[in-house]
Amino acid sequence: MNENLFTSFATPTIMGLPIVILIIMFPSIMFPSPNRLINNRLVSTQQWLLQLTSKQMLSIHNNKGQTWALMLMSLILFIGSTNLLGLLPHSFTPTTQLSMNLGMAIPLWAGTVFLGFRHKTKASLAHFLPQGTPVFLIPMLVIIETISLFIQPVALAVRLTANITAGHLLMHLIGGATLALMNISPTTALITFIILILLTILEFAVALIQAYVFTLLVSLYLHDNT
């Protein structure tokens, strides 16, 4: 059966019911809790990476911001593992859905903004009007700063969606070209296959980098409001 180019981005269903919730929960099964006092090398490596990432992200925060440590680490683990599992053939990547990414970005952004208005009301309101602004520019700047504030979660979600979707589409196109060239020009097919392997390795890096960038931007929004 011939598949559409965007088939892998459609929400999978069973008997007409969406199973995206099960797919989203699946990565948590991949990280079982160790039942031994001494961890193996894989668990030790995971813990080292988490400690390194948390140290980099939380070093700029005060005590109020550091209470979000568990949330930020859970977020980067979830997005990273979901992106990596989406690289498996014929699999579904939830982070290619803009609705899901908005569902993550908007509550996290709203939480940081609410925290800022609650604990730093004057400083949060001061962001809407830079110091030394001419009087005739005040209405325009307030509108611009308000729009830039509300566009933050949209930019956060669109960035993740666009990067993951673009990589998957490029892999799909190069893979299709490789299959089409196998009977026409084996040498060219071999070259495109090597390019596909290199692109796949790059996509593994992109999957982790995008998870880090998404979480880092949430951390910066939190820092601006605490």
From Swiss-Prot:
Cited Gene3D superfamilies: ATP synthase, F0 complex, subunit A
The protein's name: ATP synthase F(0) complex subunit a
An annotated GO cellular component: proton-transporting ATP synthase complex
Transmembrane segments: 12-32, 68-88, 97-117, 135-155, 164-184, 189-209
Keyword Cell membrane: no
Any Gene Ontology biological process: proton transmembrane transport
Subunit structure: Component of the ATP synthase complex composed at least of ATP5F1A/subunit alpha, ATP5F1B/subunit beta, ATP5MC1/subunit c (homooctomer), MT-ATP6/subunit a, MT-ATP8/subunit 8, ATP5ME/subunit e, ATP5MF/subunit f, ATP5MG/subunit g, ATP5MK/subunit k, ATP5MJ/subunit j, ATP5F1C/subunit gamma, ATP5F1D/subunit delta, ATP5F1E/subunit epsilon, ATP5PF/subunit F6, ATP5PB/subunit b, ATP5PD/subunit d, ATP5PO/subunit OSCP.
Keyword Hydrolase carried by entry: no
Main location group: mitochondrion
Source organism, top-level taxon: Eukaryota
GO MF annotation list: proton channel activity; proton-transporting ATP synthase activity, rotational mechanism
Membrane topology: Multi-pass membrane protein
Location in or out of the cell: Mitochondrion inner membrane
Record Pfam families: ATP-synt_A (PF00119)
Gene: MT-ATP6
Catalyzed reactions: H(+)(in) = H(+)(out)
Family: Belongs to the ATPase A chain family.
Record keywords: ATP synthesis, CF(0), Hydrogen ion transport, Ion transport, Membrane, Mitochondrion, Mitochondrion inner membrane, Transmembrane, Transmembrane helix, Transport
Function of the molecule: Subunit a, of the mitochondrial membrane ATP synthase complex (F(1)F(0) ATP synthase or Complex V) that produces ATP from ADP in the presence of a proton gradient across the membrane which is generated by electron transport complexes of the respiratory chain. ATP synthase complex consist of a soluble F(1) head domain - the catalytic core - and a membrane F(1) domain - the membrane proton channel. These two domains are linked by a central stalk rotating inside the F(1) region and a stationary peripheral stalk.
